């Protein structure tokens, strides 16, 4: 279970950090003085969002290893519950980064 906790928390941190940073970048980008700074913050947000997908794939891979065809595992149940939430959150941040 530790693997799943680590990946879950890592994905959560990546999304929180990416969203926070792209929101800051969007607030700063209109200031001529802060354009370069906001661009770096936006790059960081993009990198965190990309890292989310690395952990996402690792999480799916670990779940695939745990499959029991006769019974849903705790990990699968957990993933079903959080997967949609994470995907919606990811898509929202991705739109903000692309809009930036």
Model-derived segments and their meaning:
Residues 1-100:
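Non-heme di-metal
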């Amino acid at each position: 279970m530790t693997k799943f906790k680590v990946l879950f928390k890592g994905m959560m941190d990546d999304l929180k950090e990416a969203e926070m940073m792209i929101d800051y970048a969007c607030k700063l980008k209109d200031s001529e003085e802060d354009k370069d700074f906001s661009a770096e913050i936006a790059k960081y947000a993009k990198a965190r969002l990309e890292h989310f997908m690395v952990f996402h794939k690792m999480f799916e891979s670990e779940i695939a290893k745990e499959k029991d065809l006769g019974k849903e595992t705790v990990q699968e149940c957990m993933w079903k519950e959080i997967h949609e939430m994470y995907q919606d959150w990811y898509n929202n941040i991705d739109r903000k980064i692309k809009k930036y």
